[in-house]
């Protein structure tokens, strides 16, 4: 009988190419018995363009690498101080629709932020999580053989300026981050709370 457990891996600061290669390999080779995993990681500065995006979404690259990704969505920016949450879930086994998985993922972020008295919300037709009409968390998924990969990016304490160089996720929302709302919070405390919320929802 299947037990709803989940493994959380803390990968530290890694090149996005290396992590995406490992994530693709994990998804392609996983079996029905393979435990679901969540990977927490930070990436070096990089723009990633999803399957719905084009290079026209880059206004100025400013020597930041641009990488095409097989995730859903358009363009976004990753850098240290942003917590990437890769969600490697077998939807069939958990009896989840894609829509339900996305709601669960967004609720993890909302619940985590609520723990620090930050009120956040979702918007119809605009995936992600928002605070005061600014985006604090981006979301882009891919499903292969009933299993999810890619995930979310929560802005915590990073340089937001490069978001001005792009049309993020194909919309005009400004970006925000936790440190701008609650300056005394640190990356580690937020990550620990997020891990707790992940286990609450997926275990």
Swiss-Prot record:
Keyword Transferase part of the UniProt annotation: yes
Entry protein name: Octanoyltransferase
Organism annotation: Buchnera aphidicola subsp. Baizongia pistaciae (strain Bp)
An annotated GO BP: protein modification process
Reactions it catalyzes: octanoyl-[ACP] + L-lysyl-[protein] = N(6)-octanoyl-L-lysyl-[protein] + holo-[ACP] + H(+)
Swiss-Prot/TrEMBL site (Lowers pKa of active site Cys) positions: 135
UniProt family annotation: Belongs to the LipB family.
Active site: 169 (acyl-thioester intermediate)
Xref: CDD domains: LipB
Residue span(s) of domain BPL/LPL catalytic: 32-203
Keyword rRNA-binding: no
Pathway field: Protein modification; protein lipoylation via endogenous pathway; protein N(6)-(lipoyl)lysine from octanoyl-[acyl-carrier-protein]: step 1/2
Keywords: Acyltransferase, Cytoplasm, Transferase
Gene from which this protein is expressed: lipB
Gene Ontology molecular functions: lipoyl(octanoyl) transferase activity
Enzyme Commission code(s) on record: 2.3.1.181
